[in-house]
């Protein structure tokens, strides 16, 4: 499935898996924030659905409240993150212990200081060595992985790359494939993500769905 419609990807995931979703996303900046926010909104509105997110380093720009700090920091933030950077709704709610009861967040790395006041994040923290993350995803019965990908137009057709987040995704893919266990990978094209070749390059058939829209930022 290839589409430019965000909502159709959300519908595709729930239609393919069901109402109870266990989802993984890369650590750091490999997350498709817009898709994750759309999934969050869907589950928040549908109390008979559940969403468990397994990831690490859910990053957001720092927030400032004082006028002097804002005047200093805002231009820097806009240069580094852009003026319309989509904040991860699940992590903003988790930090304040305001997650809906049908949504859980499990992280194995925290951004420094972000979980100090969150009982939910601390209680659902997973102490996992990076070497064992792929195995932990498999043992946790994760059903779908979502991540940003890069795209390159060539005379021979479109090429895709996992870019700076190939390692765990490829390991997880191999584990599920060897076990003949159902698993979905959703790629979201980001126009500014660097296209890395070698093992990071994959075919379109690596993904069950590809979202390619100019609205991704």
What are these regions, as identified by a protein language model?
Residues 1-217:
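Conserved alpha/beta enzyme-core scaffold
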């Amino acid at each position: 499935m290839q589409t430019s419609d965000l909502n159709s990807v959300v519908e595709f995931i729930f239609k393919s898996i069901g109402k109870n979703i266990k989802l993984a996303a890369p650590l750091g900046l490999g997350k498709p924030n817009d898709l994750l926010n759309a999934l969050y909104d869907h589950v928040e509105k549908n109390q008979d659905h559940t969403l468990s997110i397994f990831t690490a380093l859910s990053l957001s720009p720092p927030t400032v409240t004082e006028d002097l700090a804002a005047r200093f920091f805002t231009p820097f933030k806009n240069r580094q993150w852009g003026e319309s950077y989509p904040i991860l709704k699940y992590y903003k709610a988790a930090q304040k212990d305001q997650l809906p009861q049908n949504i859980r967040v499990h992280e194995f790395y925290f951004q420094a200081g972000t979980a100090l006041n969150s009982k939910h994040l601390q209680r659902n923290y997973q102490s996992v060595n990076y070497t064992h993350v792929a195995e932990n995803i498999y043992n946790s019965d994760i059903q779908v992985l979502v991540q940003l990908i890069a795209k390159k137009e060539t005379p021979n057709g479109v090429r895709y790359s996992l870019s700076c987040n190939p390692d765990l995704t490829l390991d997880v893919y191999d584990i599920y494939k060897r076990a003949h266990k159902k698993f979905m990978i959703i790629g979201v094209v980001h126009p500014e993500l660097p296209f890395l070749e070698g093992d990071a390059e994959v075919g379109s058939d690596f993904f069950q769905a590809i979202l390619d829209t100019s609205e991704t930022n």
